Amino acid sequence: MAAAAEGDEDPRWRRCNTDCVYFLASPFTCTKGSKCEYRHADGARFNRRNCWYWFKGNCVNPSCTFRHPPLENLNKTKSLADPLSLCSTSVKAANPCYFYYNSHCSKGDNCPYLHEPLTSNDAVGTSCKATTSNPAVSKSYVGDEMVEESKDTITNPCQDTSCHIKEVPVSINPEFGEAEAVSGALETSTDIDEYMKCSAVSDLNSGDSTMDHTEQDERDSSPGFDVLVDDCLSNKSDLEHQLTTESDNKVLHAEYGIRDPVLYDMYYHDPEYYNYEPEFCGLDDRQGYLYLCQPNGAHEHESEITLGHLLPQNTEVTSDEYDRRFFNPRNFTSSVADTNFVHQHTQIRHISKRRPENRKGAKGKKDCIKRSRCLEPKNSTQQIESMPTRQRKDYLMGECPQPANHATFRGRRKKNRGKQQHVLSAKSSEHPTADFTGPKTLAQIKEEKCKSNSSFSHSTACTPNVRSFSDDFEGPKSLTELLMTKSRSSVGK
């Protein structure tokens, strides 16, 4: 209290304990920072309640979290202390307030616990007062019952038996009396649980609703218990679940080695990419191959279009490894993963990918007719083993050679057209026309026409002799008769 009194006389002490109004508004508003003469307390900035002891002029807590507004316009007169409060302070002197020393006590003088620093002399004096102020208890026995008559001299705010103040025995020896008093005070200061219980009882008895509201806010904002748990997270928004799903999909379709799934669809068609009239594919019955015709103007895809098992590019494998890899019976068995893969990639067959405009007019090696192996041959093992090593390698890599017997439909069409032209040219060569000598008269034209008709009738005159053979047919003959006629004809020759 003396320090508080001295602090009231010192204006610098009052100024350093007064809150900075700029800092209360925002920490960045005060431009002085640590050089500011007023107090910068973060706890007071978030707490809107004023310090009761600050208005009384005796707040000695440097870390007080209540606000200390300026006191120039306030009345500095101090009210006299209530005798009941003095008696209560004499009783509560040995019990320091836990909330006050943690900067959270909002009861002021109504708090039943000590709000001042505890010294050894104060502990001895308060312990003596506590022993003298205990009520006298007289016990009288009536029969088997014990009747207790107590005389209460001071009303204790804590009526619970768990909140009774521990008495410190006073030693007669003055040398050890002070040490025992200090040890008793330290023992009583460790009962924090009793402080909490008594403060809860006093909160129920107090009529200050604003104080109760403050403690309710403090209980709501207690650290360590306000834990927010979100149980509504779905698997779709879970990053770990998405990464796991993507990795599973990659492992599931790793055997296909697909970079662009649209190009591997058997129904993929891009009219802007193919600048030609659509052609069709067909099956070569002689060898059992299905070819995809790509006429002139088509360009290479980034990946080869096949319907068989796909190989990674830029790999060279021997023929024995091809036999072991591609003709394993397990590779030709269907599974659930393959079925799901085909179903997934057939759903996007109508997607058309645009190609750069500068590739439409490209020419060169890409303009040649290309085809890819679509189905395995009917007699796959025997026919492939009979192929040469180079041809077998090209076949398995999807780059099939172009022999004459494996011509495409477009090649067949060109071939047929060439044959027709050859036949027409042969017919024209059989009937050579005379050199043009000039215009002819009508008589000459009729004469040439008669000559052509006579030659035609001469050629048809031989047909009755041929048909006479059919007129001599008498019916079916036995084998012996046929042999006899054959032997006769051979003898006649």
Curated annotation (Swiss-Prot):
Bias (Basic residues) ranges: 409-420
InterPro entries (alphabetical): Znf-CCCH_3, Znf_CCCH, Znf_CCCH_sf
Compositional bias annotation for Polar residues: 452-468
Keywords associated with the record: DNA-binding, Metal-binding, Repeat, Zinc, Zinc-finger
Gene3D superfamilies: Zinc finger, CCCH-type
Tree of life domain: Eukaryota
Pfam families reported for this sequence: zf-CCCH_2, zf-CCCH_3
GO terms of molecular function: DNA binding; mRNA binding; zinc ion binding
Zn-finger segments (C3H1-type): 14-43, 45-71, 91-118
Chain segments carrying region Disordered: 397-477
Protein's name in the database: Zinc finger CCCH domain-containing protein 34
Lineage: Eukaryota, Viridiplantae, Streptophyta, Embryophyta, Tracheophyta
